[in-house]
From Swiss-Prot:
NCBIfam families: AmmeMemoSam_B (TIGR04336), PRK00782.1 (NF001987). This is MEMO1 family protein Mevan_0697. Signal peptide: none annotated. Belongs to the MEMO1 family. InterPro entries: MEMO1_fam. Pfam families: Memo (PF01875).
Length: 284
């Protein structure tokens, strides 16, 4: 299947040059890393990042922090596993797919062998295009990846995993299988958990709730993340993908974590009465 874009022209620019300009703006923005991607990267080990998926004007500079780190730690042929929440509710509860996804910067191929192996070896994961047709959480990550490719930093294939079922057992099961297949296929891998943090709460409340989850992420404690999301009614959309990413990274030997940036939509709109939180973190 060749999947066309769904939110180009809405979440990010539709035209090639406008999108390049927007991505560079995200990197150079005061809320961003303030530097363009590194062209001197070298892949040494798997890395995992958390990247938000709102409109680029709101969350793009925060996402740029994660992709700046990726640019420093990749080279050659890379498989990017992108795990995102399923906002539409369409399709299977956890699914991957095969084929090609379009972006305004050019197409990105799915690592079909990886996707098929996940489907065949994991009872949790279906091979289902339907779940991906209208979903934006994975799509909005792809222009950042393609931009790195256009800079000759690395050559990417990717594996989309959409999750509408985000209970603890499902999330850790997905993470374990991602790590298992990466080892079996000897892939140079990065894992991107696509998630925003708290939604539509006053800044003070949202930032306090998000700080609790960020602390759990930095400790790489999957069970604490799940418990604190439920206990504190944290309205983050991708806690399951985050738990899956952390589980996979721990299986792959990760020992370190770092908060790269945190911000809210209020920093853009200047309306702090109802914000969405955005965080960029790295696990390696």
């Amino acid at each position: 299947m060749i999947r066309d874009t769904v939110v180009s022209g809405i979440f990010y620019p539709l035209e090639y040059h406008d999108l390049i300009e927007m991505i560079e703006y995200c990197y150079l923005n005061p809320r961003g890393p303030k530097k363009l991607p590194s062209k001197l990267g070298r892949y040494e080990k798997p890395i995992g990042v958390i990247s938000p998926h709102a409109g680029y004007v709101y969350s793009g500079p925060i996402a740029a922090h994660s992709y700046k780190e990726i640019s420093k730690k990749v080279s050659g042929n890379i498989t990017a596993v992108i795990i995102g929440p399923n906002h539409s509710g369409m399709g299977s509860v956890v699914s991957t797919m095969e084929g090609i996804w379009k972006t305004p910067l050019g197409n990105l191929e799915i690592d079909n062998e990886f996707s098929e192996r996940l489907w065949k070896e994991c009872d949790i994961i279906d091979l289902d295009e339907t779940a991906h047709l209208k979903e934006h959480s994975i799509e909005v990550q792809l222009p950042f990846l393609k931009h790195l490719e256009l800079l000759n930093i690395a050559k990417f294939k990717f594996v989309p995993i959409s999750m509408s079922l985000q209970d603890y057992d499902t999330a850790v099961g997905v993470g374990y299988m991602v790590a298992k297949v990466a080892k079996e296929l000897n892939r140079k891998i990065i894992i991107i958990a696509s998630s925003d943090f708290s939604h539509y709460e006053p800044e003070e409340i949202a930032s306090k709730k998000d700080a609790i989850i960020i602390k759990d992420i930095l400790k790489m404690e999957e069970e604490e993340i799940f418990t604190d999301v439920v206990t504190n009614n944290v309205t983050m959309c991708g806690y399951g993908p985050i738990i899956a990413m952390i589980k996979a990274m721990k299986v792959l030997g990760a020992k370190e974590s770092k908060l790269l940036s945190y911000s809210t939509s209020g920093d853009v709109t200047k309306d702090y009465s109802e914000v969405v939180g955005y965080g960029a973190l790295i696990i390696e």
